[in-house]
């Protein structure tokens, strides 16, 4: 699945 949510989660994870 391709979504910007991954980018957001990545930011939270650091």
Swiss-Prot record:
One of its GO terms (cellular component) is extracellular region. The modification Glycine amide is found at residue 14. This is Temporin-1DYa. Signal peptide: none annotated. Antimicrobial peptide. Active against the Gram-positive bacterium S.aureus (MIC>60 uM) and the Gram-negative bacterium E.coli (MIC>60 uM). One of its GO terms (biological process) is defense response to bacterium. Expressed by the skin glands. It comes from the Eukaryota. Keywords: Amidation, Amphibian defense peptide, Antibiotic, Antimicrobial, Secreted. It is found in: Secreted. Belongs to the frog skin active peptide (FSAP) family. Temporin subfamily.
């Amino acid at each position: 699945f391709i979504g910007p949510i991954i980018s957001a989660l990545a930011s939270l994870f650091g």
